[in-house]
Amino acid sequence: GKILTKYFGQTLGLTIKSTAADFKTKADVESEKEILSILKVKLPQYNIHSEEEGKLDNGSEYTIIVGPLDGTNNFVMGIPNFSVSIAIIKNNETIAGVIYQPILNQTYFAEKEKGATLNGKKIKVNNIVDRNQITIAYNAGYKTARDCVARIINDLIKSKHKRIINNWSPSYDYCLLASGKIESIITDLGTEIYDYVAGKLIALEAGAKIMDINGKRKINNILDNFIVSNSERTNKYIFSIINPTEK
């Protein structure tokens, strides 16, 4: 967090990754380097899958997923909506996740079957189910088909609810859901694992419910393409919007 705070507001050079909208900065690289240096000392036997450096296979059943700066575009533009995301996976099941928002000094944390916290205090999803009052976040990866994105957003706009948001920092969206600030998140195909795996566990441990895009309840795992909401009722409503033939 200190590295990101140090560079926030500065003009940084960009290195393009997959598309013009997908890039990294000196802040991404240095943040990841610092995190990895700590992990390799504290948990040297674990595998590591980090956003910039890729995969380090130590033959362990545990893998640490590292997103050193989720919301790079916001960061570069001087928008204080970004976070650091770290999760621990055991045999493809997420068992712990932490997301840190350095500007607000917020640490969201969860362990499987132990609940979720914000700065050490328990948090829970809200109980809003009135479709006119729900806020929906929609996250799609850089490789998600544009026509698919356009269709879903158009369907959401035509539906009657409070608001649709895309904060450009998917990890933090799960924190908003977990702390009762929003009601639902749609995560589409192509979203990177660093952007959702820790947040998904935090939301679920705060009481959120999950459903895959085919309408089936889905346990916490590393797969993308799902709906997670404050209730099963909200999930079913969102599912009916993005799958109109299922209404």
Where do the protein language model's features map onto the residues?
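Residue-level signal for inorganic ion chemistry
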Residues: 4, 28, 39, 72, ...
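Short loop/edge segments at beta-strand edges and connector loops
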Residues: 50-52, 120, 168
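An extended, acidic
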Residues: 125-247
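A short, compositionally biased
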Residues: 10, 82, 110-114, 204, ...
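N-terminal subdomain of lithium-sensitive/metallo-dependent phosphomonoesterases centered on the IMPase/IPPase/PAP
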Residues: 1-69, 247
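DPxDG-like acidic metal-binding loop motif
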Residues: 58-117
